[in-house]
Every structure is written in structure tokens, then in C-alpha cells.
Amino acid sequence: MLIKRRAFLKLTAAGATLSAFGGLGVDLAPAKAQAATMALKTVDAKQTTSVCCYCSVGCGLIVHTDKKTNRAINVEGDPDHPINEGSLCAKGASTWQLAENERRPANPLYRAPGSDQWEEKSWDWMLDTIAERVAKTREATFVTKNAKGQVVNRCDGIASVGSAAMDNEECWIYQAWLRSLGLFYIEHQARIUHSATVAALAESYGRGAMTNHWIDLKNSDVILMMGSNPAENHPISFKWVMRAKDKGATLIHVDPRYTRTSTKCDLYAPLRSGSDIAFLNGMTKYILEKELYFKDYVVNYTNASFIVGEGFAFEEGLFAGYNKETRKYDKSKWGFERDENGNPKRDETLKHPRCVFQIMKKHYERYDLDKISAICGTPKELILKVYDAYCATGKPDKAGTIMYAMGWTQHTVGVQNIRAMSINQLLLGNIGVAGGGVNALRGEANVQGSTDHGLLMHIYPGYLGTARASIPTYEEYTKKFTPVSKDPQSANWWSNFPKYSASYIKSMWPDADLNEAYGYLPKGEDGKDYSWLTLFDDMFQGKIKGFFAWGQNPACSGANSNKTREALTKLDWMVNVNIFDNETGSFWRGPDMDPKKIKTEVFFLPCAVAIEKEGSISNSGRWMQWRYVGPEPRKNAIPDGDLIVELAKRVQKLLAKTPGKLAAPVTKLKTDYWVNDHGHFDPHKIAKLINGFALKDFKVGDVEYKAGQQIATFGHLQADGSTTSGCWIYTGSYTEKGNMAARRDKTQTDMQAKIGLYPGWTWAWPVNRRIIYNRASVDLNGKPYAPEKAVVEWNAAEKKWVGDVPDGPWPPQADKEKGKRAFIMKPEGYAYLYGPGREDGPLPEYYEPMECPVIEHPFSKTLHNPTALHFATEEKAVCDPRYPFICSTYRVTEHWQTGLMTRNTPWLLEAEPQMFCEMSEELATLRGIKNGDKVILESVRGKLWAKAIITKRIKPFAIQGQQVHMVGIPWHYGWSFPKNGGDAANILTPSVGDPNTGIPETKAFMVNVTKA
């Protein structure tokens, strides 16, 4: 047998390693034999490439599958992949065991109302029965007109959550099917992890995505890691952090705990969880006072010069326009003064007393070091060191980046946490540049893609706003969401909204005209929230009858888990689609549950793991990467895409036979676009639909399209309904040239190679642009501010941009006739320092978490975010002596999310077998707790046990003259498995949320800790 190079290297490496250990006197003969056998097995195996299914770094995998058994025999890192270069974290390295796992249910499971056990059922019985339940509940709860007489065509009785664990193509048909049924309660992981990111970055820059990409971290001069712990939670990203350090970059970590990330940093500063805005606003004050801002950038690329209207005011933590009864702002008070053409008035000297720059100087003057230190618990000298180091990147040839995650997002001020740093990055000129950006570390393999494809109640794919009751016609819908600008230098890219919305609607109902098809879309009630916390509150109140939990475990993942679990008992039926049984599917047999009293009918559908199916996922850096089938789905598991297709076809058949209320959206849904000639899910056909194709012949400029031809770029989409595009930002991903996401070409120009763009490896949205807002990396004539790491440059002789795909094809801004401004997704073309579109203020303001250890703070008399989402029936602990300690949740390297997949993977479970609570030595002494003791953590909402870990890595904080203790717990556990592993951390967390997105505040709440 010929041994290929890769197998030969494996054999020799294994032999060398085992020889070394053999020299220690250890008998390694069995291990040698096993290693040799495994290496030889992979030589003749089918080899496919895939992408890791855990965090959103997007590491490449090579999967070896036995050709005879069609089972995986080995999964390893792909050495050719430019992100991970063959390396994997513990979770990625365990992928083989995830697939080849005896704990995966072999067949669908059914739990009858009142039953205390599962029973196996056939797939046909399950799918037919679920389809019947869907059709029956839809008919019973379908609202054609609301109380005002407005046509809404909405199904109020069914909700669905999930899933960032699905491929893009599965996500798209999933949302299409749900919306055809009339669902508005559509939510998934993004709401409770990074919804704050989208709202903050879209307000600041125009798009809600990570601005740069993982490899680009190596180009940074200073990396600030705050609200994140990348060394443990995104380990392969840290490869690129260390590349930057090797080149001389300064690494900074600001975090409540001293972690593995901290150990590699030049500066570590402790900070009380929930006090980030004070720290970041202090940095803004420092930049402004010391004049460390990049003035040309601030004047030319931001709205610093915009003059704010006379209605703006701010006093004691409240902006103008606040209504105490409704707890909302009249945001018109925050608007800009405008000229006769409707364009904002500007003062480029930045001297006008009401220009944004001057308003900012006034707003931030309160944030002095003494107050910041007193509320954050961070020593003043460390605050100054962080500010000095990071603000040095305000020079044209320097770049600083921020890496953040749940530590910023999961707060009632989550959006403003991110806005605060977004503002600092603009002041320092760090947006659009190599080594800069605001980089959101997403924690689900495809949470970027699932959000792009509209798996949330408020957006359709491509971030198109959803329809509401007050928008009865398609014409009014496009008018509402299409901004108008008369500024000739503003690209105002969202003016193309009608092209994108028409193409989306036509992807679902190509045979209906736009007005008719728009009528099929469900219309939410104006002013009503349908997001995660409200969804489960409505379920708790018995308003929701049927529920899909698709690739998600809300009984553990949502805030106030006891409330969520109780809400599930109020359902008529629930469908749980997952790889393993879990706390959601089996809620009826969980703690404090009496199955006999629970009437919820439960259907558990076992699905395929990532390496068992084909399709694309999009990582945090917006790279859309194609995965191929390795092993077949284990036993009788079925891929999500096929499940969606089967359910959609069955419901269509039922409604075709007995139409009931408005059957047309379901029966006319073009499911033919989803399947191959055999009627099975076809990821390639759906990827082509997402890209978009011509429905009839037409011409754009010199480009002619024939009906059925793939659209090359979203600039060619049409507003008249002659094109499809399931998600306009993905147009260009699957063209007549083929599947761009499947590309593996590492060729680069010298300019691209300097910063590691890899434009031929897979495809990035939009239009394969790797660093968004990149025209802000050059001066007004198109010359790079940092020539040694240029992203784009204007070639005046050839009249074109070189380097990355420019963020807009126009000439530089100095060309007053043809040039356009850099931030094309904002109406005026400028990035927003001052953002009047958010619910809680145009500038970040400090507020305490809804549960906190203080009754006042030094910045204003307003303690909490006055617009935060909360429920009047739920108690909160503010300076409550029963709950004296701050608690925060976090992750460990070996587990992922609620632990549903990793707790069922023996290698990983062995490393982190049960719930623990980290606490300081001082707190342990105070409570008489020793290392390894069992302790009880209790909040207003519930209690759980954990094993105590006493550590020097957590220290008490000095907060306003008093000592405040903090404890930390991982959120990966649940009662169902393993036995004695502990329960969900979210039993303790509050159902309160950010007013912009409803993301829950699970990173700062109050508990008591006692020895069990």
C-alpha cells in the first residue's frame, strides 16, 4: 500500500512522540499499535473538509471517513486553512467523539401528555403528527385583523427559537417557512449573545458586524481585550494575538478575573462587572482632554462637526425627551439641525457650542479618574496605564483593536458598552484600518450567518426591517425603511432598500406580485416586543400554544431558567430538534416537575452533526465557508435541512386540502427552490437562491441577464420583482462562476499578503470585502495613512482602488464631483460619534446593573438605565443584605454554551465534570469555605450548588469606600447529564434586558454564597 505524505508524517510523528515517552520507562506498546493503526486507517479513508461547529473563529477541519461503514474515524485541523493553520482547541479536537457518540438518540422520541417516559416513534408518524399540530394551532391562533382593524395575517400561538447551529442554507428555509406560517415570535441565540453588537455597530458605522477578521489581529499595535477572555473562549484567535505580540504589540486585559488571557498581557486591570461604561467614558474624556484624537479622521469621517438641534439637553443621567410613565424617550429631541435640503448643518472647525464634538466634551467631563476608580474598583494608576497605552494608537500609522464578547453585550447597557468603545475607535482613527476595528468575538459557529439570514423577530435576511401593523402596503413598507439624502457625496446605500426587499420577497413567493406577497408577511403589533425575554414571558402567561426549540436549549440558556422551565409546562406541544436529549426536551422530568400534571406534548427529533451534512457557515469575520459531508448521519438522525423540507411539505399538503385561514402564504411558498430532483434538501440550490437569480430577462448597464441566470453583485438586483435574492448581502457568493464559499486559493498580491487578506480563500460578505469601512484608512486623496499595512489605495493612473475590495467603488472624497464618503451605510456617509437612533441615549451614559451592590453612583442621580426592559412581576436585588455578592457567568475552554454537546463528549466532560464557583481567598475566609467544599449560591430567583474553587485570580473590589466581593460561575451545566454535574447558572440570572435589543443581563447580578 502506498502511504501518502500526510499519513507518512502522522506515522513518523506518532513514532517520535511514543519513542520519547518510551525512554521514560513507560510501556507504550499498546499506544504505539493504536497510533499506527489509526494512521494507516486514514490513508484509505474518504477525506473531506469541514469547519468547526463550536465558536465563530471558523477553524478548518479535515474529516476522515471509513468508506465501508461511512463512519468518521478521525477529525483533525486543516493545515492549509489560513485561520487555524491546522491547530484546534480542545472542543474542535473532540469533534470525532461528538459524531461517533453512543449517547446520540437513535430514533425520534415522543412524550405523551402526562407521561413520565419517552417512547420511540417512526419518522413518518412524528413528522405527520407535528405537521397536524402546526396546522391546527395556526388555524386556532391566526389573527387576520387586529383590534384596530389593521390586516396583520399573524399566527400568535406558535413560537420558535433556533438556531446558530444550522448552516446558512438551513437557516434561510427555516425562516421562510416560519414566516409563511405567520410567525412573529422568531428568535435564536443571537438575541441573548450578540444582539447588542448589531445595534451598537450599525448605529456607529452602518453595519452590525465584526469590522475586521481574525488574521488581521496580527496587524495591531495595541490589543485591548475587555469583556472577553479569548485565550480560553476563542483559543485559536489567540494565535493571532500572539503574532501581534511577537511583532511588538502591547496586549491589555481589563476583566473582573485574572485569566489565561491576562497571563500573556503587558497590562492587566481588574474591573467590577457591569462598570465598563465608566471606564470607557473615562478613556473618551482622556482622548479629548489630551487631544490624542486623529483630527483629520474625526473631521472627515465622523459626525463630530454635525450641529445638534436646540431640543437636546442632558441632566442627571437623563437625556431630553424622557417620559417617566412610558419609560421611553422622544428621540426627535436629539436630532440634528438641517439645511434647506435636509442635510445636517456642519461646523468643521468643531467650535460651534452645539456641534457633536463640543457636546461630547461637555458630556464626558464628569468622568474623572477618582470617580471611575471608585465605581469600577480599578486602581487609578492602572486606569492611566491602560489609557496611555491604548490612546497612543491615535497616530495615523498606528492601529489599536478591541476584542470583546459577552462581558460587554449581556447587560442592560450592552449596546452602550459597545457604543462607548466604538466612539473611542473613531476618535483614534482605528476603523477601516488593518489592525484596528471593533471585533466582536462571536461564540456560535454560525451565529453571524443565522443573524444575516434573519432568525430574529425584528429583521428579515440582510437586515431588512420586519413589517408592522401600521405598514399595510408594500409601497409604505419600502418608504419607511428607505432613507433619503440630497447630499451628492453621500452614497446612502440603504436607498437601495426596495431592490433588496423585492428580491427577498420574490425568493419566497416568485409567482405573486410584490403587493400580494407583502400581504403574506406577518405584521407585528406596533410597540409590542416579541424578543426572547418577552416571548418566554408570554409563554409563561399561557399565550403561546406551540413551540419549536431548534438546535437550542432554552431551559438552560435563557435568563431566569426556572421561569423558562415553568413556561414550557403551559404549552400544548413542543418540538425539540437536537443532537442529544437535553433539559429543554426533557423539562417535564426535571427538578421540581411532576410529569403527571404536565400536559405538554413533546416531540424530540434527532438531527445530524456538522460533519454529517453539507452547506455553508459564516464566521465572526464574515467569511462564508463551505462544509462537505463526511460520515452519514448516525443511525436514524436526519439533517436539519431535510427536517424543515419535510415539515414544510407536509403542512403545505394539509393546508392545500383544508385551507382554513389564509393558506396562500404556505401553499404558494416556493419549496421547489429548496430541493433536488429527488425532493431532498439541496444546499447548492438554496445557496443559489440566497445569492439571487434573474426571474426574467433584463439588462443593467452593459450587463445582460437571462431568466435563471445567477446575479453577479447586489448592484444588479431589481426593485420591480425581476430578481430573487434571499439575502442581498450574500449576492456574489454563488454566481455563474461557481460556489465562491468553496474556494481554497491562498494567492495574494504583495499588498494583500502584508496584512493577510486571503481574498481567494472562501468568500466574505459584502462583495468579498475583508475589512469593512476600508476607505477610511486613506486620506481624502486615497493615500493610506499607514502605507506599510495599507488596506486599500487609489491608483490615480488607472483610476481604481487596489488591495482589498473597497467599501464603495467611487473615487476618493477629494473628488467633489464623483467621490463618495467612506461610511456608505449611514445616510450622510459619516460614522456616528453621536448616535440619535438608540433607545437609551445618543451618547453612552453610566448606569448600574439592575441588580447592584450600591444605591447611588457618582455620575448622576439616575441609578439604572431608565429605559431597560423589565417585567413588573419580577423582584430585583439592589443593595439587598440577603444577596451581598456580585455574581458573573462565564465559559471554560472545554465546554460550550449550555454544555449540551460538550457534556455529552467524554473527553471534554472528564476535563470539566461539574459546576464550580470561583471566589477570592478573602470571601472564602469570611464564609468559612475551603477549596472543594460544596456551596450554595442563591439569588432572588432560585438557588443551585457548586464546588468551591478558592483562587488568587479573583480579588475583592473597593467600591465607593466599601469592600465588595464577586464570585464567578460557568454556565455550561444542566441537571440532565451528567449525574451530579450541577444545574444551570441561569437559574440565578434576572429577566431584565437592554432596551434596544432585549439582550438579558447575565453578567452582573446579586447572590448569596454559603457552605452547603
UniProtKB/Swiss-Prot annotation:
Ca(2+) binds at residues 393, 395, 398, 428, 430. Binds 1 [4Fe-4S] cluster per subunit. InterPro entries: Asp_de-COase-like_dom_sf (IPR009010), Formate-DH-alph_fdnG (IPR006443), MoPterin_dinucl-bd_dom (IPR006657), Mopterin_OxRdtase (IPR006656), Mopterin_OxRdtase_4Fe-4S_dom (IPR006963), Mopterin_OxRdtase_prok_CS (IPR006655), MopterinOxRdtase_cofactor_BS (IPR027467), TAT_signal (IPR006311). The disulfide bond is likely to be broken in the active form of this enzyme. Predicted to be exported by the Tat system. The position of the signal peptide cleavage has been experimentally proven. GO terms for biological process: anaerobic respiration. [4Fe-4S] cluster binds at residues 52, 55, 59, 89. It is an enzyme of class 1 (oxidoreductase). W-bis(molybdopterin guanine dinucleotide) binds at residue 193. Disulfide bonds join 852-879. The keyword NAD applies. GO terms for molecular function: 4 iron, 4 sulfur cluster binding; electron transfer activity; formate dehydrogenase (cytochrome-c-553) activity; formate dehydrogenase (NAD+) activity; molybdenum ion binding; molybdopterin cofactor binding. It is found in: Periplasm. Residues 1-35 form the signal peptide. One of its GO terms (cellular component) is periplasmic space. Keywords: 4Fe-4S, Calcium, Disulfide bond, Electron transport, Iron, Iron-sulfur, Metal-binding, NAD, Oxidoreductase, Periplasm, Selenocysteine, Signal, Transport, Tungsten. SMART domains: Molybdop_Fe4S4. PROSITE patterns: 4FE4S_MOW_BIS_MGD (PS51669), MOLYBDOPTERIN_PROK_1 (PS00551), MOLYBDOPTERIN_PROK_3 (PS00932), TAT (PS51318). Its EC number is 1.17.1.9. Its cofactor is [4Fe-4S] cluster; W-bis(molybdopterin guanine dinucleotide). It catalyses: formate + NAD(+) = CO2 + NADH. Optimum temperature is 56 degrees Celsius. It comes from the Bacteria. Belongs to the prokaryotic molybdopterin-containing oxidoreductase family. Heterodimer of alpha (FdhA) and beta (FdhB) subunits. This is Formate dehydrogenase subunit alpha. It comes from Megalodesulfovibrio gigas.
